């Protein structure tokens, strides 16, 4: 599926002081049980604000996906030489309503590139990313910037070359595509 507007960027939409508070609380939440990382964020007001922006992007970009709810938001701290391989979110089941599917994904940058971390570029791709069919490489995302994209797009983070990148990610969910 080719989209005229495959993503939406909302620069510095979340204030710096709120980003700092989320980082502080997120660092306290990260737990590792040896099998998986547990780092769910449950800020109701934050999820409402993000859901509103995501729903507006859904409409304004002409995606018009039916969404019913949001899945959990996850806080992540990506450290030195860590990265995310190419992935897409619509292949995994939502943790809250596994009978639904992830429809729209988002990533909120909580700290500042070239001050708090270096590298760790966010990249989006159509289809098989190894064909280098990139949509965009976001290498200068300011603190508080939100990127919204359909969950069937591939995305990744390149390696962190210094510092720690802090983000929140999540999905709006809905019925499976017909």
Describe each region flagged by the PLM:
Residues 1-148, 152-178:
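Fe(II)/2-oxoglutarate oxygenase catalytic core
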């Amino acid at each position: 599926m080719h989209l005229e507007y495959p993503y939406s960027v909302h620069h510095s939409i979340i204030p710096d002081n709120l980003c700092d508070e989320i980082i502080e609380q997120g660092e306290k939440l990260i737990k590792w049980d040896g099998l998986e990382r547990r780092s769910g964020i449950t800020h109701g007001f934050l999820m409402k604000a993000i859901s509103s922006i995501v729903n507006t992007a859904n409409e304004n970009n002409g995606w018009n996906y039916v969404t019913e709810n949001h899945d959990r938001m996850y806080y992540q701290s990506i450290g030195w030489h860590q990265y995310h391989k190419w992935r897409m979110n619509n292949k995994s089941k939502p943790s809250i309503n596994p009978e639904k599917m992830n429809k729209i994904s988002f990533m909120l940058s909580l700290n500042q590139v070239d001050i708090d971390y270096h590298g760790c570029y966010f990249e989006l791709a159509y289809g098989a990313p190894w064909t280098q069919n990139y949509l965009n490489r976001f290498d200068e995302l300011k603190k508080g910037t939100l990127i919204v994209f359909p969950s069937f797009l591939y995305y990744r983070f390149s390696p962190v070359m210094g510092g720690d990148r802090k983000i929140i990610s999540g999905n709006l969910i809905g019925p499976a595509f017909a």
